[in-house]
Structures are given as structure tokens and as C-alpha cells.
């Protein structure tokens, strides 16, 4: 009873004092539009709720210290101070982190080259040894692709399982490697990694990597010229990642690799090369569309119960090694297969039930990591969060976490050592405030690993430009430091999936005819494909990697009624970014988004320094423009009522403590 009286007294005092401590507003346009009495009422409410939230947080605590440190896997290269080779057979030149290729021709023929012999390149220099798998490339040709991670002299020697074949075994060479001289960050800073132990990706040298992906599930159907055009455009727009699956590829891994696959693999190689030459990281799924894993296993020994037989496992390892050999020298991220976490909707696709224990893609993950000496990030493309989340309801998981999102099952890759980020599939509601369950699951329960919104709704298939940019802002300000944008008709080129239906995200309607008419050239010019680039520019100016999501903690932000927001600030709250929207237009077409009245109101920021001096600017996510910079002084309670947005669209507010 005393406790309740204390709270009531505190709240009454807060309300009374709030009238005498309202801040002096700067004279600027963003304060016009809402009647003064409503602004005053909103501000008093904000102070009231903020103070109450602070009190509750002190009593009950928060989840904000519950994030574990990520487990850092041991690197795959070996410490080695090998001696130089006195008289190498060949000498090559290279630049750091750029892929190189060496071909060896066997003087001996094999009945089944893919199966009969393996070749490996041992590359050493600067105290490191890399054991890099080679691949058979048709006829009597074996190739190896490698990248030198540092300047200096590197040496190599081949090792062949047929040691008597001297045309493949004990071949030697020297590589004179100089520093990369080009313009792309991926080669200036090194391949992307999670080994820094952060909730975001970094380059090899520790520089934060901004993940902004463009989706291409039908890379096999895209032409080489298309890929070249798309890459050049996406780089100019600010994209950093090309997300692909091999749908439509002209090779077949289900029953061995033969001469019949050579031309299809050469075509795919050229696309990998173009993506790399444009400085993009290639987040690629392996081998084929996911349902082909069934015939692959059946053709190579079948199942032992619900698990692949030993011979099927051996074949899975062999094709995994082959994929790594062809593509690991490029800047890549491995994503395994379409929605294979946790089971590719097994009940809907008529394959043996996979679960936490027997998903065959868990084997592929381990095999890829075994042969990938560059330790590229690895994940499994997840089903939508209605089926699988990071921890979800936790049923069957090998660890214990707080359940935030009980509607989904947990990832089946949580206990896989090689799995080091979560490729989440999530399309947040465009018409109501998030309840933050998905976001909290990804932030608190991801074992310290990055969790990104790898797949949302595609522009001009299930959403339009508002929804496509909203998903990116929501992801980054919710601690999901990566976003996979996608547009129709590039998300899956020539795919007619769902074109026969009209769709609506609650904001915009996409008609069947709009879907049918969409071309891949159109997708290059969708407004949101530029707008996510503006988002990247803005967030990089704020050191996004220091921003911590505060979710629904009202001690940081109290939204006005029917205002959508995503809020993040740095550790001491001296840098704050808030994405906000709400509209009065009930037609919800193009420039409107919600069926609820929200006006152009915003809310109250909290956890500021009492009577502290701050500046703020509005950022327009539609055109990338900034407002003037304004000043304000926080109340003695450490709050500030923002007032109206400058315009009735989604906007971004950046608040900084004054120097």
C-alpha cells in the first residue's frame, strides 16, 4: 500500500512540476500544425509516462544487460613460418584480397575426375598457412582460386591425393602480393567477418561493414550482361551485398559433377566474378533450390531413417568442398539454401521431416566451414518469423533464453559452431506499432551473433516504396544491422509467383497488372532502391554500430498516440536516432500509411541530461535531405517533447548532445 501511495504521489508531483519546466521551443516550422493545447497535453503525458517508466525500470530492472558475448571460432589458417621456395616453377603478381586463379593440366586421365582425385594448394606467407581446395574444371584441368590477405611474398605447393601424378602434385610457385590499389572497401579492408564478436559485420581489419543487400534468387536465369548492369547500378545506389540463389542455374549437383555441368558452372563463375569486380559481397545459397536436397540424398545412398546415410553424407561433403573451391576466394557470405532454417516448411513440401536434430543443411554448414580457409560468415536462410525465429518458443533448443516470441520455433542452427549470424525473414507491419517481440528475440537471444532482416516484402510485389524503405529503417534501429531489399522483377527474375493476385501491405495496393508489367529494368529505378542508399549515408554519419535499440522502453521515448517509431541511441544517449511516421490521410495511398489517426505528431524523448543542451535535425528518408539544425534544452526531468514533424510522411530525427 505504501508503495502504491509513493507512486501516486510521484506522478502527481511530476504532472504539477511539468507545467513549470516546459522547455523553450526554438522557432522553427516543425512546431506548427498541432494546436498548442494538444502539444502541451502531449508533453505533460510524455513527462508523466517517462518518469513512471524510469521508476519501474529501477524497481524491476530491464533486459538491457542480457546480451551474451558472441563465441569467436578459431581461424582456419594455420600459424606457419615456412621457408621460401628457392626455384618456383612460376611467379605471379597479385593484390591483397583480390581473387587469383591458377590452372593445372593433368597428364593422367581419370575415369571419374570429380570422384577419383582431389588437389589442394598450400599457400604460405607472413606467418600463415592456408590449405585451399582446388576443383576439377572439365577435361584434365584442375584449378585453384585464392586471395592473399596481406602484402609480401607468398609461396605455394600443390598436394594431390594421387601423389604419383606429378602434373598435379608438388607443383610450386611464388606470389608477389602488393597492397590493393583500387576503390572498393571490400579489398581495402578485407573480407567480411563476424570474428570481431560484435552484433554487426566487420571487414577483416575491424572496420564496421554496412550490410545492404539486393535480392536475386534466380541468379541462374539472369544473363551475364544483366548482372553487370545491375551491379553497376546497385553500387551507385549504395548497395553492398548481392543476395543470390542458384534458381535457373544450368548445372546439376544431385548426382555427381560431370562434363555436362561445365558450361553452366562457367556461366555462374562469370557472374561471381562480375559481382566481385564491382566490390560487392556475394551472399549466396549453395548448389540448387532447397527441394533438390531430397534427390541428391536419394541418388547417393539415400536415407538411414530420417537422416542421410553415410554415403550420402560423404557426397554432401564432396560437393560442399567443390563449391568452396570455386567461390571462397571471392568476398562471399554462405546462406546454404532457400528457407532451410529450420526445415524448409517440411510439412508443406512432402519431404522427410527435418527438425533440430536431422536437418541435412546442418551437415552442409559444417562441411563448408571445414574447407573455407577464409572463414566467411555462414548462416541459413530462415523461414518467415511466423514459422521460425532466432529462439522463438525455445522448444527443442539446446540453450535457455527468455521467450519473447512464442509464435515460432527456434532456429535449428543455434548449436552449429560454423553458424555465426541469423538470416531472418521478417516483414514488420506497416499499419501498426510493433510489439517488439521479434526484434527482442533477435537482439537478446541471438547468442551475441548478428541478426539481419535478410528477406522482407519485395517492392512492387507485396509492398511499394514506403514499405521497402520502412523495413530497412526498422531493421537497423532495432539492432538488426543488415537489410535485404528486393524488387520485382529482380528478386527472382522471370518468376511469376503471386502475379495473378492483387496485394496490399495495408498502406499500398499492388495490382496484378502492376506485377505482370514489372521488368528488371524497372526494379533498378524503384524509388526505394535509392532511398535505402540515403538510409545508409545517414546511418554511416551517425556511427550506426554504436546505436543500441531501446524498443518499448518508455524511459527513452514516449510516442504520441498512433505514432509508429523505431528508436536507438548510443550508450550514454548522447546520439539518438528515431524513425517516425503517422498520417491523417485515410486513403493510405502512396504517401499515407496507416488507417489510424496519428497526424504529424511525434512524442517525448527521455533519459537526457537534466537541463542539458542538445541539437537536432530532421532527415527526409524519401529524398535524403536534412532540415536546419535546431537547439533545445531538456527539462529538469531529462525529457524533451519533439512536437510536430515538418511534413506528413515518415521522417527521421537525429538528436545530439551539444559539445
What feature does the model see in each segment?
Residues 100, 142-144, 638-640:
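Short strand-edge motifs at loop-to-beta-strand transitions and within beta-strands
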Residues 118, 163, 180, 186-413:
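Active-site mouth of glycoside hydrolases
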Residues 375, 408-501:
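Catalytic-core region of carbohydrate-active enzymes that cleave or remodel glycosidic bonds
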Residues 84-94, 109-113, 451, 461, ...:
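Aromatic- and carboxylate-lined catalytic core of secreted/periplasmic carbohydrate-active enzymes
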Residues 72-127, 132-134, 174-181, 563-569:
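Non-catalytic, glycine-rich low-complexity segments
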Residues 130-196:
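Extended acidic/polar, glycine-enriched regions
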Residues 10-18:
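Bacterial N-terminal signal peptides
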Residues 17-41, 51-55, 59:
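Sec-dependent signal peptide cleavage junction
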Amino acid at each position: 500500500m505504501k508503495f502504491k501511495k509513493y507512486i501516486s504521489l510521484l506522478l502527481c508531483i511530476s504532472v504539477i512540476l511539468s507545467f513549470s519546466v516546459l522547455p523553450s521551443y526554438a522557432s522553427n516550422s516543425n512546431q506548427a500544425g498541432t494546436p498548442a493545447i494538444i502539444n502541451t497535453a502531449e508533453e505533460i503525458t510524455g513527462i508523466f509516462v517517462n518518469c513512471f517508466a524510469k521508476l519501474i525500470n529501477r524497481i524491476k530492472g530491464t533486459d538491457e544487460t542480457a546480451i551474451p558475448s558472441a563465441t569467436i571460432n578459431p581461424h582456419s589458417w594455420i600459424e606457419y613460418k615456412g621457408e621460401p621456395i628457392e626455384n618456383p616453377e612460376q611467379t605471379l603478381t597479385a593484390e591483397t584480397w583480390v581473387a587469383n586463379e591458377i590452372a593445372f593440366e593433368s597428364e593422367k586421365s581419370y575415369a571419374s575426375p570429380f570422384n577419383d582425385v582431389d588437389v589442394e594448394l598450400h599457400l604460405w606467407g607472413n606467418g600463415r598457412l592456408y590449405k585451399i581446395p582446388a576443383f576439377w574444371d572439365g577435361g584434365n584441368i584442375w584449378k585453384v582460386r585464392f586471395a592473399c590477405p596481406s602484402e609480401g611474398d607468398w609461396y605455394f605447393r600443390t598436394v594431390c591425393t594421387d601423389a604419383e601424378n606429378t602434373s598435379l602434385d608438388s607443383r610450386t610457385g611464388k606470389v608477389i602480393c602488393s597492397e590493393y590499389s583500387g576503390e572498393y572497401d571490400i579489398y581495402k579492408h578485407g573480407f567480411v567477418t563476424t570474428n570481431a564478436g560484435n552484433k554487426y559485420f566487420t571487414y577483416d581489419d575491424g572496420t564496421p561493414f554496412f550490410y545492404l543487400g539486393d535480392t536475386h534468387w534466380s541468379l541462374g536465369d539472369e544473363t551475364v550482361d544483366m548482372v553487370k548492369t545491375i551491379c553497376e547500378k546497385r553500387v551507385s545506389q549504395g548497395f553492398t551485398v548481392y543476395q543470390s540463389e542458384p534458381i535457373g542455374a544450368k548445372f546439376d549437383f544431385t548426382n555427381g559433377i560431370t562434363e555436362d555441368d561445365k558450361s553452366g558452372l562457367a556461366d555462374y563463375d562469370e557472374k561471381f566474378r562480375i559481382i566481385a569486380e564491382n566490390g560487392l559481397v556475394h551472399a549466396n545459397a549453395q548448389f540448387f533450390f532447397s527441394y533438390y536436397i531430397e534427390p541428391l540424398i536419394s541418388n547417393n545412398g539415400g536415407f538411414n531413417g530420417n537422416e542421410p546415410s553415410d554415403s550420402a553424407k560423404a557426397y554432401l561433403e564432396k560437393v560442399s568442398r567443390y563449391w568452396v573451391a570455386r567461390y571462397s576466394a571471392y568476398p562471399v557470405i554462405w546462406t546454404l539454401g532457400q528457407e532451410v532454417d529450420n526445415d524448409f516448411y517440411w510439412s508443406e513440401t512432402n519431404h522427410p521431416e527435418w527438425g533440430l536434430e536431422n536437418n541435412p543443411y546442418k551437415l552442409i554448414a559444417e562441411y563448408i566451414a571445414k574447407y573455407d580457409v577464409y572463414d566467411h560468415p555462414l548462416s541459413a536462410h530462415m523461414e518467415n518469423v511466423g514459422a521460425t525465429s532466432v529462439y522463438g518458443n525455445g522448444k527443442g533448443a539446446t540453450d535457455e533464453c527468455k521467450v519473447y516470441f512464442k509464435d515460432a520455433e527456434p532456429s535449428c542452427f543455434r548449436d552449429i559452431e560454423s553458424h555465426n549470424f541469423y538470416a531472418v525473414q521478417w516483414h514488420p507491419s506497416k499499419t501498426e506499432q510493433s510489439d517488439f517481440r521479434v526484434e527482442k528475440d533477435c537482439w537478446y537471444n541471438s547468442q551475441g551473433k548478428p541478426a539481419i532482416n535478410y528477406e522482407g516484402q519485395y517492392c512492387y510485389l507485396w509492398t511499394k516504396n514506403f514499405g521497402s524503405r520502412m523495413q530497412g529503417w526498422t531493421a537497423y534501429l532495432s539492432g538488426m544491422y543488415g537489410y535485404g531489399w528486393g524488387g520485382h522483377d529482380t528478386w527472382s527474375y522471370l518468376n511469376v509467383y503471386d502475379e495473378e493476385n492483387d496485394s496490399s501491405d495495408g498502406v499500398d495496393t499492388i495490382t496484378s497488372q502492376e506485377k505482370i508489367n514489372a521488368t528488371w529494368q524497372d526494379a533498378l529505378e524503384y524509388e526505394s532502391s535509392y532511398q535505402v542508399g540515403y538510409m545508409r549515408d545517414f546511418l554511416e554519419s551517425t556511427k550506426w554500430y554504436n546505436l543500441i535499440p531501446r524498443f518499448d522502453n518508455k524511459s527513452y521515448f514516449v510516442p504520441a498516440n498512433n505514432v509508429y517509431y523505431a528508436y536507438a541511441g548510443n550508450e550514454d544517449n548522447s546520439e539518438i536516432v528515431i524513425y517516425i511516421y503517422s498520417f491523417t490521410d485515410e486513403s493510405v495511398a502512396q504517401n499515407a500509411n496507416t488507417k489510424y489517426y496519428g497526424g504529424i505528431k511525434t512524442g517525448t524523448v527521455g533519459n537526457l541530461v537534466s537541463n542539458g543542451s542538445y541539437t537536432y535535425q530532421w532527415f527526409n528518408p524519401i529524398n535524403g535531405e536534412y532540415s536546419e539544425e535546431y537547439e533545445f534544452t531538456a527539462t529538469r526531468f531529462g525529457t524533451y517533447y519533439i512536437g510536430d514533424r515538418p511534413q506528413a510522411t515518415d521522417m527521421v530525427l537525429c538528436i545530439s548532445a551539444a559539445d
